[in-house]
């Protein structure tokens, strides 16, 4: 038996942006559904954060999500666990967007509590987002389940949230040593340590996703093989502009159509050529253009300066400052805020 596994779709993501929905839809139209049909797959496992906004969703966005995705999904058996973005309260799953918005779809089974079931010859433990309301039963299932595979929406220490930025806190990998495999949503970057693997979301959504491969997976329960299906489409592109070394008169603008473009200006002498570049980008149909001017300093006296990421600098500052609070808790709070800020463009 083959099942499709997808996670962190955030179907209403980027505030329901029409540009992003067109990008999402292209993946479903050209990659996801054709692959399911070609592989003869009839079961889809959704590992959480199907929707993005915990508080609200506009009617127009919901209508196109239902028409373009969930109506097409009626031919499949769907098993969907809750993620942190689909629960209204942070300490309870009682009110959640999937149960409220998808009641009309009899083919979709939604899990707000841990649940064991079988696909083919494999036993699965489904672990929705763990909060105050389901923590006790979740802990018990993690410790006692005899399932082969655990699928959840988990926060596990040491994994990359985005390339180069590691999550600190949450559960330890050793907590899941009883399972042959652990597959999780939540972090959008694909990564693996030991038996634990973050599967990654299907498509780019923010600039920190640039060039980070995305897609979904197919699992064959009989061969125990997990296969990644890459999404070849990208919505963020970069142009390194240097009119001293390169002419842009024959530049291929079409590859930037329907994308968000960031121009990194290395050298700009021909201002007329640069303005023509901008005009042609908008003419071909880019969503937006951002320009980053670089400063070149020929003095190499600072070549040994250590470069640190934002989160490291924040943690070092907390370590140095004299404050009457638990610094570990403060670091976790700053990490959460930083991750949320990375999702704002």
Summary of predicted features, one role per range:
Residues 2, 9, 13-116, 175-179:
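Core catalytic region of metal-dependent phosphoesterases/phosphodiesterases
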Residues 3, 43, 122-123, 149, ...:
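Structural motif
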Residues 8, 44, 49, 65, ...:
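Divalent metal-coordination and catalytic microenvironments
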Residues 10-14, 52-55, 81-92, 117-118, ...:
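Active-site environment of divalent metal-dependent phosphoester hydrolases
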Residues 70-74, 141-145, 173-178, 254-256:
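Short, conserved loop/helix-junction motifs that constitute active-site signature segments
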Residues 86-173:
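Conserved catalytic scaffold of divalent metal-dependent phosphoesterases
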Residues 162-226:
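Conserved beta-sheet core of the metallophosphoesterase superfamily
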Residues 221-345:
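Accessory, non-catalytic peripheral segments of nucleic-acid enzymes
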């Amino acid at each position: 038996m083959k099942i499709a596994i997808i996670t962190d779709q955030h179907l209403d993501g980027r505030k329901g942006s029409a540009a992003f929905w067109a990008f999402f839809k292209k993946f479903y139209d050209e990659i996801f559904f054709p692959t399911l049909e070609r592989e003869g797959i009839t079961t889809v496992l959704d590992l959480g954060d199907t929707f993005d906004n915990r508080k609200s969703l506009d009617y127009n966005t919901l209508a196109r999500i239902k028409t373009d995705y969930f109506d097409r999904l009626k031919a499949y058996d769907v098993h969907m666990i809750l993620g942190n973005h689909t629960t209204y309260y942070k300490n309870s799953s009682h009110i959640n967007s999937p149960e409220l918005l998808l009641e009309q779809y009899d083919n979709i089974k939604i899990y707000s509590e841990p649940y064991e079931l079988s696909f083919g010859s494999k036993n699965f433990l489904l672990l929705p987002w763990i909060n105050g309301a389901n923590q006790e039963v979740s802990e018990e299932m993690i410790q006692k389940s005899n399932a082969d595979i655990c699928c959840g929406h988990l926060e596990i220490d040491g994994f990359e949230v985005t390339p180069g930025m590691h999550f600190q806190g949450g559960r330890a990998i050793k907590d899941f040593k009883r399972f042959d495999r652990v597959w999780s949503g939540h972090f959008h970057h694909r990564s693996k340590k030991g038996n634990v693997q973050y599967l990654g979301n299907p498509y780019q959504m923010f600039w920190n996703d640039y060039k980070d491969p995305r897609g979904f997976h197919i699992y064959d329960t009989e061969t125990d093989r997990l296969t990644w299906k890459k999404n070849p489409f990208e919505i963020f592109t970069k142009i390194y502009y240097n009119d001293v070394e390169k002419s842009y008169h024959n530049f291929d603008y079409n590859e930037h159509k329907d994308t968000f473009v960031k121009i990194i200006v290395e050298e700009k002498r021909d201002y007329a050529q640069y303005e023509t570049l901008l005009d042609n980008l908008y003419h071909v149909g880019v969503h937006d253009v951002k320009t980053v001017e670089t400063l070149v300093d020929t003095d190499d006296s600072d070549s040994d300066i250590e470069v640190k990421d934002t989160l490291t600098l924040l943690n070092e500052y907390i370590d140095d400052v004299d404050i009457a609070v638990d610094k570990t808790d403060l670091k976790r709070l700053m990490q959460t805020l930083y991750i949320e800020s990375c999702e704002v463009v």
